[in-house]
Amino acid sequence: MWLGEYTWLNVFGIFLQATFIQNILLSNFLGMCSYLACSARVSTANGLGMSVALVLTVTGSINWVVHTFITGPKALTWISPSLANVNLNFLELIIFIVVIAAFTQILELLLEKVSRNLYLSLGIFLPLIAVNCAILGGVLFGITRNYPFIPMMIFSLGAGCGWWLAIVLFATIKEKLAYSDIPKNLQGMGISFITTGLIAMAFMSLTGIDISKPSAAAPTSDILETPNASSITTTNLKPVKKVRIAQQRAAKEKAINIKRGKTQ
């Protein structure tokens, strides 16, 4: 339940895949509003990215518990086997959003006490993390892939770190673009989308790396009991060769008899 068939190498692959290869922002375009609005300064983008990564990691883990023990198929059997047919799947989205909103409110109160400047710089976008589609999308992606608990937590962390990395990279480039000579028709959203597309293309270069899927190895007893592949092929090929040779001989004899009949 906690790790399942996944090895720690697969878990590391899940983190890499969620952060770079299937980046939740650059591949699925989730959370674009706050990505474009809060990327004017690197410090603001860094704070928002850190908040999104924290919220996604914690709420992804909590919502996995909710899905496994409350709303999933046969989730209530731990209470009583008679509740196996009870399906609370229709409440799943509502509960997920409530969990995300509650943790976002806790994070907002903590930032207001700990980092007042970051709290003021994020403004309205901090409470909007509760309805950020990147948070809910990351949770739903992990749930639909049926990850065990630890892979789900690492996937949520990787998705949050991927969003964090994307907005910090974009904010860094955006600060440089402020002093660049950009054509008038491309200023604003135009150059922002072009820059985002180039960053996404750079992340796509890692597409071939896939170590996130568990490899089910065959038991040693099955390997010892299976006959040698070479012996199987040789024994099966011998009758086939004999049949082909006999057919070729029969065809040659038939052709010779036909020629003899014509000459006579």
UniProtKB/Swiss-Prot annotation:
Keywords: Cell inner membrane, Cell membrane, Ion transport, Membrane, NAD, Sodium, Sodium transport, Translocase, Transmembrane, Transmembrane helix, Transport, Ubiquinone. Its EC number is 7.2.1.1. GO terms for cellular component: Gram-negative-bacterium-type cell wall; plasma membrane. GO terms for biological process: respiratory electron transport chain; sodium ion transport. It is a multi-pass membrane protein. It comes from the Bacteria. The chain crosses the membrane at residues 11-31, 50-70, 90-110, 123-143, 149-169, 189-209. Pfam families: Rnf-Nqr (PF02508). It is an enzyme of class 7 (translocase). It catalyses: a ubiquinone + n Na(+)(in) + NADH + H(+) = a ubiquinol + n Na(+)(out) + NAD(+). GO terms for molecular function: oxidoreductase activity, acting on NAD(P)H, quinone or similar compound as acceptor. It is found in: Cell inner membrane. Belongs to the NqrDE/RnfAE family. NQR complex catalyzes the reduction of ubiquinone-1 to ubiquinol by two successive reactions, coupled with the transport of Na(+) ions from the cytoplasm to the periplasm. NqrA to NqrE are probably involved in the second step, the conversion of ubisemiquinone to ubiquinol. Composed of six subunits; NqrA, NqrB, NqrC, NqrD, NqrE and NqrF. This is Na(+)-translocating NADH-quinone reductase subunit E.
